[in-house]
Regions:
Chain B
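Extracytoplasmic small-molecule ligand-binding "clamshell" domains
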Residues: 29, 35-105, 287, 293-297, ...
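Bilobed "Venus flytrap"/periplasmic-binding protein-like clamshell domains
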Residues: 41-50, 60-75, 109, 129-185
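Sec-exported extracytoplasmic/periplasmic mature domains
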Residues: 35-36, 72-77, 97-101, 138, ...
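Bacterial N-terminal signal peptides that target proteins for export
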Residues: 1-11
Length: 383, 344
C-alpha cells in the first residue's frame, strides 16, 4: 500500500480514483435522499412522463408538432429553437463584432471614439432590456391586414416577416451537383496556387477567379435547367397569411437584440487581440513595403486570433445561455417548453430542470469542442 | 451532515431539496406547527386585481388575502397573524410541499392530475371560474367556434394552454399559440395585433378589458371552454390541517346562508335564536375544539372579513372595478355552486 503512495505516477491514479469514489458516493447520497423524500411526500418521480401526450401546442416549431405528440418531442422542439437562435446569433454577432472591432482601431479619431461610445452603451445595457426593446419595436410594425409588402412576395407585419417558400423541382438536383463539383474544383485550384507559392514563391491570386467560377457556373446551370425553383408567395386568408416561411417577431427580436449585444463583446475581444500583437510586427511589415490590408490579413490577424479565440468560446457559450431569455417575450425555446409549460402541466420540476441542465450542458460542451479545434488550428505551430 | 445538505441545495437550487433537507425527519401536524410558530404562511398570487394585490398603504388586498385573514382569525383569534408569501404559478406546489407555505390560496384549479401526483390535497373551492376569449370587436367574431386559424395569446404556467388545445381539437380547428407573460405585455400584443385573441380565466379577462383605454372596442366572448374551480390546497396526509382549511371556508359560506354578516355577527353570537347559528358561532357545543381551534373560531373569522358574499362583493363584485357578477359563485339556493355542508 505504502509502495503505491511513494510512486508518484501511481499515487496520482490512486488520488483520482479516490476522488471519483467520493464524488459518486456524494451524488448517490443526494439522489437517494431526494427520491426517498419525494416518495414519502407522495410525489411521483422519474422520466416516464416524457412519453405522455403533451396536450399543448407550440408556436414557431421547426418540426411538425401537435398537441397529441409527447413531452419528449416538445423538448426537442424547444431544443431546436434554442439551437436555431444560438446559431443565428453566433454568426451575426461574430461578423458584426469583427467589423466593429476593426473599425474601433481605425486611424480616424472620429470613427474610433464614436464606436467606442456605441460599444460602451450597448455593452452596459442588460441583454433582457435589448430583447424587450426590439420586441416592442417589432410589435409596432403594421398589423397583419395592413402589412407592408415588397412586390407582393415578402410581407412585413407585426406578426412576422413572411417570405416566399422555395419549391425545388427535379432540375435543382443537377444544379446542386454542379455547384458541389465547382466547389471542389475551386478548392483544387487554391491548393495548387498554395503549392506554387511554397515551391517558387510566386503569388497567384485565386479568390476572385474562384468566386467567378463557382457562382458564374451555378447561375448558368440554373438558367440552363430552366429555373428549377418555384417560389410560393404567402397569401392572406382568414386571420393570417398562408404558405411561405414566417420569421416570428419573437425570433426576430431575440436575434437582432442579442446579435447587437454580443457583437459589442466580440468587438472588444477583437480590439484586445489586435492590440496584443506587438507594434514591431506592423513596423517590420511596412518596412518590407507590405500594404496595410495585407499586413492586417497575413501578419496581425493570424497572431491576434490566438488571443481572440479562447475568450470567444466564453462569448459563444454565453449566447447559448442567454437565448433562454427568449421566454420573456414568448420565444418557444427550451426554457419556455420544458422549463415552462411542460413543468407546469406535469409538476415534475426536478426532472424538467435536470433535463434542461443536461441539454444546455451538452450543447455548451459541443461549442467548447468546436472552438477547441479552431483554437488548435490558429495556435502557434511548434516545430 | 446538515452543512452538506445546505451546500447541496445551493448547488441544485431546487427549492424542494432545501425544505426537505432541513426538516425531513419530523412530520408534525401543520396546525401544531403554525400554532407553535405564532403565525401562518399564506401562499397567494403575486398581483391579480381583486384577488391578491398590494393596495393603499402597501397593504395586501383581495379575496385570497381575505381568506388568509379568516384563517388567521380562526386559528389565533387575531386577523393579523399571517404572512403573505406571493408564489408564481411555476413554484406554487413546490413551495407548498417544501413547507415554505402552510396553505396555497393562490387561484389554483383543482384538477385530477394535481391531486393524484403532486403530493398535495385539495381542501375546498374558493372561486368558480371558467376560461374564455377576449377579442377586438372589429373582427366581428361572436363565438369561439369562429376562431379557426387565429393567433392566440396565452399566459405561461397555467392550465389555459391545455384547455385551448383541447377545445380546438374538439372542434377540429387550428390556431397559432403565442405564449406571453400575463399583464401589460399580453394586452399590448392584443391591442397592436400580434394576436387576434387572448385566452385566460374569465375573471381575469373581465379585469383586463377594463385596462384598455377604450374597453368598448373589445368583447369577452360568451363561450366558456373549461371549468376552473379555483381551490385551496394543503400538503397530502395532513388531515387535521386540511379540515381547518375546508371548514373555515365552509363557515364563511354557511354564514351567508344564515344571514350572519361582519356587522351583525356579535349580535348573533350574544343572542342566537337559530340553533345552527349557535353551533356555528360557538355559543352552543364545543365545535371549535373538535378541530383543535378556539370555540369562537367561526365568529372570529366572520368578524374579521364577513361572510362569503361580503368578501366577493367587496373585492370583485359589481361595485368594484372588476365588476364581476356572482354567476356560478352564487349560493346553491340561488342557482349557484357555492354550498356548505351542514354544521352538526
Amino acid at each position: 500500500m505504502l509502495m503505491i503512495l511513494r510512486d508518484e505516477r501511481k499515487r496520482a491514479i490512486f488520488d483520482q480514483v479516490l476522488f471519483l469514489v467520493i464524488v459518486s458516493a456524494f451524488i448517490y447520497y443526494l439522489s437517494a435522499n431526494l427520491i426517498e423524500n419525494l416518495n414519502r411526500l407522495g410525489i411521483s418521480t422519474g422520466f416516464s412522463f416524457l412519453w405522455q401526450e403533451a396536450g399543448y401546442q407550440i408556436g414557431g416549431a421547426l418540426i411538425d408538432f401537435d398537441d397529441t405528440d409527447s413531452y419528449a418531442l416538445a423538448h426537442i422542439v424547444g431544443l431546436l429553437n434554442t439551437l436555431l437562435a444560438t446559431f443565428l446569433i453566433i454568426v451575426s454577432a461574430s461578423i458584426l463584432g469583427f467589423i466593429i472591432g476593426i473599425l474601433r482601431m481605425s486611424p480616424n479619431p472620429l470613427m474610433t471614439n464614436s464606436i467606442r461610445y456605441v460599444i460602451e452603451v450597448i455593452r452596459n445595457i442588460p441583454s433582457l432590456v435589448h430583447i424587450v426593446i426590439w420586441f416592442s419595436l417589432a410589435l409596432h410594425l403594421p398589423p397583419v391586414r395592413q402589412s407592408f409588402d415588397i412586390y407582393n412576395t415578402v410581407f412585413i407585419s407585426n406578426r412576422g416577416i413572411y417570405l416566399p417558400d422555395p419549391n425545388f423541382e427535379s432540375g435543382m438536383w443537377g444544379v446542386l451537383f454542379l455547384f458541389i463539383c465547382l466547389l471542389a474544383y475551386a478548392f483544387f485550384r487554391k491548393r495548387k496556387a498554395q503549392q506554387l507559392m511554397r515551391e517558387t514563391g510566386k503569388y497567384q491570386a485565386t479568390f476572385l477567379s474562384n468566386t467567378l467560377i463557382i457562382w458564374g457556373g451555378t447561375i448558368c446551370a440554373y438558367l440552363l435547367f430552366g429555373l428549377p425553383i418555384t417560389w410560393q408567395a404567402p397569401t392572406l386568408s382568414g386571420f393570417d397569411f398562408d404558405g411561405g416561411i414566417t420569421i416570428a417577431p419573437e425570433l426576430f427580436a431575440i436575434w437582432i437584440a442579442l446579435s447587437i449585444y454580443f457583437s459589442s463583446h466580440v468587438a472588444e475581444l477583437v480590439r484586445g487581440g489586435v492590440q496584443s500583437v506587438s507594434k514591431g510586427q506592423f513596423e517590420a511589415a511596412s518596412a518590407l513595403g507590405v500594404r496595410y490590408s495585407i499586413t492586417m490579413k497575413m501578419v496581425v490577424i493570424p497572431q491576434a486570433m490566438r488571443v481572440i479565440v479562447p475568450p470567444l468560446t466564453n462569448v459563444y457559450q454565453n449566447i447559448l445561455k442567454t437565448t433562454s431569455l427568449g421566454v420573456a417575450i414568448g420565444y418557444a425555446e427550451m426554457t419556455a417548453t420544458t422549463g415552462g409549460t411542460t413543468l407546469n402541466l406535469t409538476g415534475q420540476a426536478i426532472e424538467c430542470i435536470l433535463l434542461m441542465m443536461v441539454s444546455y450542458g451538452i450543447i455548451s460542451l459541443i461549442i467548447a469542442a468546436i472552438m477547441d479545434q479552431i483554437n488548435k488550428h490558429v495556435a502557434i505551430v511548434e516545430r | 451532515m446538515i452543512k452538506i445538505k445546505t451546500i447541496l441545495s445551493a448547488i441544485t437550487s431546487v427549492t424542494l431539496l432545501t425544505g426537505m433537507g432541513a426538516t425531513a425527519p419530523v412530520f408534525a401536524d401543520t396546525l401544531d406547527d403554525v400554532k407553535k410558530r405564532g403565525f401562518l404562511r399564506c401562499g397567494t398570487g403575486e398581483a391579480k386585481a381583486g384577488f391578491a394585490m398590494p393596495g393603499d398603504n402597501n397593504q395586501w388586498q383581495g379575496m385570497e388575502i381575505d381568506y388568509c385573514k379568516a384563517l388567521s382569525s380562526a386559528v389565533f383569534g387575531d386577523e393579523t397573524k399571517f404572512e403573505v408569501v406571493p408564489v408564481t404559478s411555476k413554484v406554487r406546489f413546490t413551495s407548498l410541499t417544501s413547507r415554505e407555505i402552510d396553505v396555497l390560496v393562490k387561484g389554483t384549479t383543482w384538477t385530477y392530475s394535481r391531486d393524484a401526483k403532486l403530493g398535495v390535497d385539495f381542501a375546498a373551492y374558493w372561486f368558480f371560474d371558467g376560461q374564455g376569449f377576449l377579442i377586438k370587436k372589429e373582427l366581428g367574431v361572436t363565438s369561439a367556434k369562429q376562431l379557426n386559424g387565429a393567433t392566440i395569446c396565452i399566459s405561461p404556467g397555467t392550465t389555459s394552454e391545455k384547455n385551448v388545445a383541447d377545445f380546438f381539437r374538439t372542434y377540429d380547428m387550428k390556431y397559432k399559440p403565442v405564449v406571453i407573460k400575463a399583464g401589460p405585455e399580453t394586452l399590448d400584443a392584443l391591442q397592436k395585433g400580434r394576436c387576434d385573441v387572448i385566452t385566460n380565466d374569465l375573471s381575469a379577462l373581465a379585469s383586463d378589458r377594463q385596462k384598455f383605454t377604450n374597453p368598448d372596442d373589445f368583447v369577452v366572448l360568451q363561450d366558456n371552454i373549461a371549468k376552473e374551480p379555483l381551490s385551496l390546497y394543503v400538503r397530502q396526509n395532513d388531515s387535521r390541517w386540511k379540515d381547518v382549511i375546508t371548514w373555515t371556508r365552509n363557515a364563511l359560506v354557511e354564514a351567508e346562508e344564515l344571514g350572519i354578516t361582519q356587522e351583525n355577527v356579535g349580535q348573533h353570537a350574544k343572542h342566537p335564536i337559530d340553533p345552527r347559528v349557535a353551533r356555528l358561532l360557538g355559543a352552543k357545543g364545543a365545535y371549535g375544539e373538535m378541530l383543535g381551534l378556539p370555540n369562537t373560531w367561526a365568529h372570529d373569522a366572520i368578524s374579521a372579513v364577513g361572510n362569503y358574499g361580503e368578501i366577493f362583493e367587496r373585492n370583485v363584485g359589481e361595485q368594484t372595478r372588476m365588476g364581476l357578477t356572482r354567476n356560478l359563485n352564487q349560493q346553491w339556493y340561488d342557482g349557484g355552486l357555492v354550498f356548505a355542508p351542514p354544521f352538526r
